[in-house]
């Protein structure tokens, strides 16, 4: 595991060249949480209620905005207001996967207006390097109003059974991240990827990509559709900087208490990793 993973969030924030990553680490340190809650609900009311109730205990809220049956201006303004109120970032799990010209329009514009409210987005690199280049171009354009407040995670690995996001796909994900590091903040992956080397790229001394790991659940090992879970401790131990939990929190009998439990477990695992416990 990279030596950067052994550093505290505050230490990494102090030297990180990416302003959004710096802010993310500062949020985590201030709130003592590395939890991302995956709010897979289907109405604006449910989403905003969940964001308000869980906001104090999370660093990031992850949305699938296209599953909302009533997406509107209220969704955008409400979510942005709650992010400000509770000091968390918004991650739209759009998984962009198309040619560059199309994803630029999907990201900045369109019905969902994703660039307007989502600090973080993600993409698959199945279309090739062009998808990362296109999103990076959009974010660096002179007329893009959000500048360094936006960032991209590359979907380098998945936790579903039989996932094809392995091998050369994962290696190329790291290659593209290194090439477009001003916009790419890290990966959605099951482990730390900083030591990946290829004929195209190799790790640099200052490299510090953030790792988000999905499929974190304290009470289940999987579901009927092939999802494979791991605990906060095992995820952080493999290199996760931020753990993503969905049903384990929002479907719990008491989502607030569940969020607090994930917060504690995730934070304890982080302290153990950096040698502060």
Curated annotation (Swiss-Prot):
This is Orotidine 5'-phosphate decarboxylase. The keyword Lyase applies. The gene is pyrG. The active site is at residue 95. Belongs to the OMP decarboxylase family. Its EC number is 4.1.1.23. Substrate binds at residues 40, 62-64, 93-102, 229, 247. It holds the Pfam family OMPdecase. GO terms for cellular component: cytosol. It catalyses: orotidine 5'-phosphate + H(+) = UMP + CO2. Signal peptide: none annotated. One of its GO terms (biological process) is 'de novo' UMP biosynthetic process. InterPro entries: Aldolase_TIM, OMPdecase, OMPdecase_AS, OMPdeCOase_dom, RibuloseP-bd_barrel. GO terms for molecular function: orotate phosphoribosyltransferase activity; orotidine-5'-phosphate decarboxylase activity. It comes from the Eukaryota. Pathway: Pyrimidine metabolism; UMP biosynthesis via de novo pathway; UMP from orotate: step 2/2. Keywords: Decarboxylase, Lyase, Pyrimidine biosynthesis. The keyword Lyase applies.
């Amino acid at each position: 595991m990279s030596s950067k993973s052994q550093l505290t969030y505050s230490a990494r924030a102090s030297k990180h060249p990416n302003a959004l990553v710096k802010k993310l680490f500062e949020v985590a340190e201030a709130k003592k949480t590395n939890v991302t809650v995956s709010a897979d609900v289907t109405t604006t009311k449910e989403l905003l209620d969940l964001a308000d109730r869980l906001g104090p205990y999370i660093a990031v809220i992850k949305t699938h905005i296209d599953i909302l049956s009533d997406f509107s201006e209220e969704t955008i303004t409400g979510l942005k207001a709650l992010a400000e109120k509770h000091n968390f970032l918004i991650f739209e799990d759009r998984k962009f996967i198309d040619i560059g010209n199309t994803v630029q329009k999907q990201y900045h514009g369109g019905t969902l207006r994703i660039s307007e409210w989502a600090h973080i987005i993600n993409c698959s690199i199945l279309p090739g390097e062009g998808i990362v280049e296109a999103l990076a171009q959009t974010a660096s354009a002179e007329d893009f109003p959000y500048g360094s407040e936006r960032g991209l995670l590359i979907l380098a690995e998945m936790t579903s059974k039989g996932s094809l996001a392995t091998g050369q796909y994962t290696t190329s994900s790291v290659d593209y991240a290194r090439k477009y590091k001003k916009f790419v903040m890290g990966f959605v992956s099951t482990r730390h990827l900083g030591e990946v080397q290829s004929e195209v790229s190799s790790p640099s001394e200052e490299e510090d990509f953030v790792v988000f790991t999905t499929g974190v659940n304290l009470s289940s090992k999987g579901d009927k559709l092939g999802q494979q879970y791991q605990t906060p401790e095992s995820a952080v131990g493999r290199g996760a900087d931020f753990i993503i939990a969905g049903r384990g929190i929002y479907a719990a009998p008491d989502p607030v208490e569940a969020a607090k439990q994930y917060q504690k477990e995730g934070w304890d695992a982080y302290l153990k990793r950096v040698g502060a416990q």
